[in-house]
Amino acid sequence: MVSINIRPDEIGSIIRKQIEEYIQEVKVVNIGTVLQVGDGIARIYGLDEVMAGELLEFEDGTVGIALNLESDNVGAVLMGDGLTIQEGGSVKATGKIAQIPVSNAYLGRVVNALAQPIDGKGQISASESRLIESPAPGIISRRSVYEPMQTGLIAIDSMIPIGRGQRELIIGDRQTGKTAVATDTILNQKGQNVTCVYVAIGQKASSVAQVVNTFQERGAMEYTIVVAEMADSPATLQYLAPYTGAALAEYFMYRKQHTLIIYDDLSKQAQAYRQMSLLLRRPPGREAYPGDVFYLHSRLLERAAKLSSQLGEGSMTALPIVETQAGDVSAYIPTNVISITDGQIFLSADLFNAGIRPAINVGISVSRVGSAAQIKAMKQVAGKLKLELAQFAELEAFAQFASDLDRATQNQLARGQRLRELLKQSQSAPLSVEEQVATIYTGVNGYLDILKVEQVKRFLVQLREYLVTNKPQFGEIIRSTKIFTEDAESILRVAIREYTELFLLQEK
């Protein structure tokens, strides 16, 4: 029989060593219980230390956001249908506020409000992440807007100019071409080093597919990210989509780049937020919207900025879209967004139906940045245009009652009709600055007066082609100097004269 020699001191030292090496890891998890769930809302008991806006994880993997922190329960909105969440199920607080991955790899992709790809082209690699709700740049971080953001639409670039870092509202009834103005602006950024983000909120999947298709055909997807939450998405995701778009645009803005973001449209986001708020039993205010619906939009649109030179002079230009009912601009959401933005482009159903497209009502559209956002060449030719159109609108109303008009009035009416014709443009056909300058110069200096009104559009299209092929130096001068010099003017005058003769011969 072998005797085992037990040495207590050796065993003691082993035990002591193990005790010293033992690291006590206590994982504290904040857990609650589902009291009630339905309509995209869950009431949870027991989440004591949850933050406002914190992400919560349910047993089935659904994620929610804690919005209502009440004395006895927490109201959370779900980012999914929540059909498999059961009463009494457990909920875990993640300790995180909603954030999304960001990187250059997002360019050319279609993603949802959680920045997950929905275009079937595989995962997007990203090493960085940004909070969906980031604070807007402060006063010291900004500088005033001074560079133009060309939309390619004559009516806007000449009379309601938009600058980089501005927020310009596009407002009008449904089916007046609001999305067309926004998408044309994206198409016009080709080769301008501007990253675009198009956020579609609560739209038909077919409309979004059509927009994406246009971008792909015209090569605009290379510099564009589409964030889409369709009409059948949960209200929570429709509410988050614009903030996700803003976070993606901010990533590029803080990297010294210029960005353009379009929110299409904020009325639907406000409706989704109203639905969430009413289901959370928050008290309704005007038009049943909650009291903080102004803050919903102001904290989003204040993130658009022109950054100071210390921060690299990046910019984020926002074009929010708001839909009106029967042209009523004094409803709650339209007045809110008008008061937040730096101007608005008003699209009118009457003009649209009369065949004036883009249907921009120049009389009540404004840009509060003004000519600071125009190149000198455009200022030189466009000054007269707005005045002449305003006088024409006044005269036209007056001329309906008067039967015998003097010669000067008739001439002014004829000029006005031709100028209105000059502002018409086909969809997805944005014009470069030099083409716009040539077009406006032709109109305000009376070179169109000898043509019939129905010939004007055709004449201008062909004149622009003639300039490109026969007088390329005109475009070069405008592009390089950004000034409508005397040389440019004389080249343009000769070109107009030569082409008018050709055109009139063809017409005969």
Curated annotation (Swiss-Prot):
Q: Output the InterPro entries linked to this UniProt entry.
A: ATP_synth_asu-like_sf, ATP_synth_asu_C, ATP_synth_asu_C_sf, ATP_synth_F1_a_nt-bd_dom, ATP_synth_F1_asu, ATPase_a/bsu_AS, ATPase_F1/V1/A1_a/bsu_N, ATPase_F1/V1/A1_a/bsu_N_sf
- Reported EC number(s) for this entry are 7.1.2.2
Cellular component annotations (GO), alphabetically ordered: chloroplast thylakoid membrane; proton-transporting ATP synthase complex
Q: List the residue(s) that the UniProt entry marks as the site Required for activity.
A: S365
**Which catalytic reaction applies to this protein?**
ATP + H2O + 4 H(+)(in) = ADP + phosphate + 5 H(+)(out)
Please report the record's description of how this protein sits within the membrane. Answer: Peripheral membrane protein
- UniProt subcellular location: Plastid, Chloroplast thylakoid membrane
Classification via CDD domains: ATP-synt_F1_alpha_C (cd18113), ATP-synt_F1_alpha_N (cd18116), F1-ATPase_alpha_CD (cd01132)
Protein residues bound to ATP:
G172, D173, R174, Q175, T176, G177, K178, T179
Principal subcellular localisation of the protein: plastid
User: Which stretches are transmembrane?
Assistant: none
The protein's GO terms of the molecular function aspect are: ADP binding; ATP binding; proton-transporting ATP synthase activity, rotational mechanism
Question: Its function?
Answer: Produces ATP from ADP in the presence of a proton gradient across the membrane. The alpha chain is a regulatory subunit.
Subunit details: F-type ATPases have 2 components, CF(1) - the catalytic core - and CF(0) - the membrane proton channel. CF(1) has five subunits: alpha(3), beta(3), gamma(1), delta(1), epsilon(1). CF(0) has four main subunits: a, b, b' and c.
Similarity section: Belongs to the ATPase alpha/beta chains family.
PANTHER family referenced in this protein's UniProt entry, alphabetically: ATP SYNTHASE SUBUNIT ALPHA, MITOCHONDRIAL
NCBIfam families in the cross-refs: atpA, PRK13343.1
Please identify the protein, giving its name as recorded: ATP synthase subunit alpha, chloroplastic
User: Which species expresses this protein natively?
Assistant: Psilotum nudum (Whisk fern)
